[in-house]
Amino acid sequence: METPGAREAIETPITILLLGDAGCGKSTFLSGLKCIRGQKPGSSLKEPIELLHDTDQPFVYEINFSKKSFTLEIYDTENPNQHWTTLQPDVVLLAFDISNRKTLDGLKGWRSDVIRYFQQGEGERIPVMMVGLKRDLRKPGEGLIYPQETYRIAQELRCDRYAECSAVTGELMTQAFEDLARLAYMTTTAEGGQTKGGCVVM
């Protein structure tokens, strides 16, 4: 992200909905985003993550990007104040646990829910990013989920972006957050956030 300076402010917050099976790492991921602010890409977290509270939703992140300043408001399925199906997200983030194939298989159902609740009219109406969490737990052995497989699934689910990271170690967290911010910003432009030509891997 760019250094602070004179930027045009986007007044309306950009709403992001984080979906994924229970236990896939959503809460730790959101908490980790708070810890990486100001860190350089590739650096590791120096302090333990302090978990956010579900009752504090939406989780707010102030962004400076592409000479613009804007606010991300992120919700997940554990929001006790408002059921996620009643939201009107600008971007959907589909999350799974890289060490748990069941959570990867569950994304098909979540993607169907996105179409059911948020798609209006013909064609895709909302940008979707898929993110693999707990990257530090990817171990060789039976059931190993390779990046090539997850990219293929992201394409099959018609996602616009794919990224993976580890909130615990901080690996690729900055890159994943920047890509999410970029996708969110694109929803405020005439082009929108949908990717032409398929899923982009970060």
Predicted region positions:
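TRAFAC-class small GTPase G-domain
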Residues: 1-188
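C-terminal-of-GTPase-core extension/linker across diverse P-loop GTPases
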Residues: 182-202
